[in-house]
Amino acid sequence: MTSPFLQRHVGPSDSEQQQMLSALGYADMAAFLADVVPEDILDEFPPQGLLPPGCGEAEALVHLREIAAANNSRRSLIGLGYYGTSTPALIQRHVFENPAWYTAYTPYQAEIAQGRLEALLNFQTLISELTGLPIANASLLDEATAAAEAMSLSYGICRRTEANRFLVDANVLPQTWAVLQTRAEPLGIDLERVTPEQASFDASVFGVLLQLPGADGQIWDPTAVIARAHEAGALVTVAIDPLAQALIAPVASFGADIAVGSAQRFGVPMGFGGPHAAFFATKDTYKRQIPGRLVGQSRDSAGNPALRLALQTREQHIRRDKATSNICTAQVLLAVMASFYAVHHGPEGLMSIARRIVGQRRQLERALQSLGFVVPDGERFDTVTVTSALAPAVHQAVGEAGFNLRVLPDGANPAESTGFGIALDECTTADELSRLVAALATAAGQTSPSLPLAPVEELCGVPERVDPWLSQSVFHDHLSETELMRYIQRLVSRDLSLVHGMIPLGSCTMKLNAAAELLPVSWPAFAGLHPFAPMAQAAGYQRLAEQLEAWLAALTGFAAVSLQPNAGSQGEYAGLLVIRAWHRSRGDDHRDVCLIPTSAHGTNPASAVMAGLKVVAVACDADGNIDQQDLAARAAEHADRLAALMVTYPSTHGVFETGIRGICELVHRHGGQVYLDGANLNAQVGLCRPGAFGADVCHLNLHKTFCIPHGGGGPGVGPIGVADHLAPFLPGHPMQASPDQAIGPVSAAALGSASILPISWMYLRMMGAEALRQATAVALLSANYLALRLDPHYPVLFRGATGRVAHECILDLRPLKRDAGIDVDDIAKRLMDYGFHAPTVSWPVAGTVMVEPTESESLAELDRFADAMIAIRNEIRDIESGAMDASNNPLKQAPHTMAAVIAEDWDRPYSRQQAAFPLPDQQQNKVWPAVARIDNAYGDRNLICTCPSVEEIAVAVAA
């Protein structure tokens, strides 16, 4: 039986699908699929029996509630980078649960993304003010990988050939240490764990990572250590707690070169490990090496301030194997939440929360001392760690009282532990503290002491923050809920997302993110768990993960799946590390060559380099396919050293290549493994399986194919599926039992961004195998329908052997530059006037656009987009004929803002109506660009990546 959810997920009705098939010349869907998907990989039937049959929303939610109920939401005071936090209801309602925020894409088209960019600029300003460093990025994946990025940056900047040592604070978070080990080994970096004050620095040291506060809560003044590191020519990274930093002097004042951390405790639930927005701040000197997205201010064609992504030439999609990082998708939605949390509280509110935690921690320490526990000397922020023979009794007593504490040593059985750690947080109350102390007293065999008031004196041993901070008006003007609600809505009105219309970005799969799929993410049973809570308390998450892994394995034809990678780029990296580990287990350490087609996503070569592999390019032929003769030559040339081929399927040119089985067999004959980039898996689900036609590893983008929303640039999840012989090498984690051959972790938490996995679970549970197959078929049909409509106006550049495209098509705009002086950016900006986000521009071929409609868009929406593109082509024809001016025309002047259209003066040779309302239906559904066309070059030359201060505004007003 067909899933009742199918008609909600798929846009075109049955009759509309038949209409589209008829337009393409097919009698039915089966005939169409036989023409599109190569016969030798097309599965006759979907994997029935391996997935449950589809069901409705209510039934799926009932099943998922049963799973969630198996989680035990004890109050976790474990700390280690994850803390209880109170998400303001306003932010949960108007941001986290608002599709205008979570369905947008990365803000490449900045003129229709000003709201999101402003929220991210607020985030960057927050981090810059907390750290005292002038440049902060718009988020990274988690604190551990941010620290690894800092290590890589430090290594890349160092020019001393003998420098390959990276010193790491012994008090670093355990997950950070583990991720650093994973990242360092393939790059030839020697890690050394040290007590910072006792560390020796010489010319072999290129960088240092300090933790402030440390994993045990200690805070200290690192100024002298940093000075010694600088004398030896090493860069210093400090991993910070942003809430502690509200009280501690900015780390830049200690001399830090880089600061990293997680903004999780700024209003984002723990969620069993993620997703959370990490951050990376540094000195201006290193702005061109900073990983991830960077929002900067520029100006538009009218001279008004405008925001956009800055310094993009340093990123992986341009620099490829020379990129500073493979990061693309990060954690924009979570960074936006954290920024609004800071706007909601303001600097005084943040400091008040931090002071309250310090006071409660001092109360706790006095109670511990009165019970006979030895509290270590030194100053702390929120955490106290105690070594005691009573530790097993403590863990039992606090567990019975409903608490989890850190078990020392990390990973030990509580019954055999030698100590415990207690981390207080924003959610700690006086009553909770009393119950905790009572449990500690029970363990000590004593009467519970009263909790004396503990006034917050000055922090000892570390300079405090004394200068004003967050003086920007945005952090002071919205402290009332009314003002903040209106501010959030103002930003929403400056953005375009799926609530406005189709976003036809090729290779991005902007499909429906159904409300029922997202609803469970905010359930406390999923949101409230600490990732290092005892596994027995996470039985629901384990069951969810096991089912999701099994379903994904069935759909892809692989033997095993890891859900740990928290982005597609990290899935690539993890998959290549798995291949590398397999080769090394066989004594083939010398296999280090990775073949990559020149058409590949930029993350492919960037990930290969990170995995310690040497990239060898493989040519593509005139039809966009892998040049199989060149592939055979390269495979033969490097046969003794061949580790892997990275291949995207369907290809990045939007077609099913007919020789994929032969390609896989060729690589295997030469001793290599096949890594399949799953960015285009939405064209395969239910129709063909990578594991069945020869791939050994494939990463899946749950934020594309399996309905996790893009969030304006994250979160994402990039799990990997592997063949049976590679399963023992899937990523492990230091806080859980892992197979002996497992590679190290690639994410801070064992399940990566665990709290958004219910989204994909809901999608698969509601759809079932047959509906998934139908959805994929409609995605292919919609792309071919658009190709049919648009080809007479914009030639489709690449087609498969039967003349069909896969789930996306590339339109060739290059002749328009020659004939009319119109380039791809002109068309992208003009589409905004028609109410559309542009397709992917100039990738994988410069001067083209790649269109991917997905299965979720109705025939009416497909036609609306086609009508807009055709209308723009007719405007270009007017330029070609001379009927319209070559420079002063609707395309060159696009996009048109409301301010421009209603201005008293209108000196353009076309009407205001043609500028703003070129199609009749726009009178009722107009999306206005917030700014005119942005001058990107000006912004990069005059880089401004934070909000202006009050003083800067005053100077500007006076001028």
Swiss-Prot record:
InterPro entries: GcvP, GDC-P_C, GDC-P_N, GDC_P, PyrdxlP-dep_Trfase, PyrdxlP-dep_Trfase_major, PyrdxlP-dep_Trfase_small. The keyword Oxidoreductase applies. One of its GO terms (biological process) is glycine decarboxylation via glycine cleavage system. Signal peptide: none annotated. It is an enzyme of class 1 (oxidoreductase). The keyword Oxidoreductase applies. Pfam families: GcvP2_C, GDC-P. The modification N6-(pyridoxal phosphate)lysine is found at residue 704. One of its GO terms (cellular component) is cytosol. One of its GO terms (molecular function) is glycine dehydrogenase (decarboxylating) activity. It catalyses: N(6)-[(R)-lipoyl]-L-lysyl-[glycine-cleavage complex H protein] + glycine + H(+) = N(6)-[(R)-S(8)-aminomethyldihydrolipoyl]-L-lysyl-[glycine-cleavage complex H protein] + CO2. Keywords: Oxidoreductase, Pyridoxal phosphate. It comes from the Bacteria. Its cofactor is pyridoxal 5'-phosphate. Its EC number is 1.4.4.2. Belongs to the GcvP family. HAMAP family: GcvP (MF_00711). The glycine cleavage system is composed of four proteins: P, T, L and H. NCBIfam families: gcvP (TIGR00461). The glycine cleavage system catalyzes the degradation of glycine. The P protein binds the alpha-amino group of glycine through its pyridoxal phosphate cofactor; CO(2) is released and the remaining methylamine moiety is then transferred to the lipoamide cofactor of the H protein. This is Glycine dehydrogenase (decarboxylating). It comes from Parasynechococcus marenigrum (strain WH8102).
